[in-house]
């Protein structure tokens, strides 16, 4: 009897996980976070600034529209599991700037100034 209950519970949990699955778009991904919003950019990065100055370690990007966004460079305020992801985002933005790839949309945390990038969607 216990095996049957466990199987039913396990199947219900597994079905629940499969139903939600991985996000299929930046909009779905962004909706999983609090204090975020989507910005439709559809443009190339106009300027890329990287600062390694103490507590203000970050990358700042701007667009022709004047919109400004940041990615913090990993520092003591981040846990180890966040550091690699932040470094990848910083590297992605640098490559995007250098190759003049268009950024389609950004998901940003709007509780920081400038708004901090949580996810990015690009197009060629």
Swiss-Prot record:
Where would you find the membrane-spanning parts of this chain? none
Q: Which GO terms describe its cellular component?
A: extracellular region
> Which residues, if any, are the signal sequence?
1-21
Q: Disulfide pairs?
A: 30-107
The keyword Disulfide bond is annotated on this UniProt entry: yes
Q: Which SUPFAM superfamilies match?
A: Bacterial enterotoxins
Key words of the record:
Disulfide bond, Enterotoxin, Signal, Toxin, Virulence
Which InterPro entries did the record assign? Answer: Enterotoxin, Enterotoxin_B
Its biological function? Answer: The biological activity of the toxin is produced by the A chain, which activates intracellular adenyl cyclase.
Q: What is this protein called?
A: Heat-labile enterotoxin B chain
């Amino acid at each position: 009897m216990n095996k049957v209950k466990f199987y039913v519970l396990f199947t219900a949990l597994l079905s629940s996980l499969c139903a939600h699955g991985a996000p299929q778009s930046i909009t779905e991904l962004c909706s999983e976070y609090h204090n975020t919003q989507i910005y439709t950019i559809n443009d190339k990065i106009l300027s890329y600034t990287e600062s390694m100055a103490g507590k203000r370690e970050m990358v700042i990007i701007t667009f022709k529209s004047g919109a400004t966004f940041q990615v913090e460079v990993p520092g003591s305020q981040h846990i180890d599991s966040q550091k690699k992801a932040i470094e990848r985002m910083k590297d992605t933005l640098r490559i995007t700037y250098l190759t003049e790839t268009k950024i389609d949309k950004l998901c940003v945390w709007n509780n920081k100034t400038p708004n901090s990038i949580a996810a990015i969607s690009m197009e060629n």
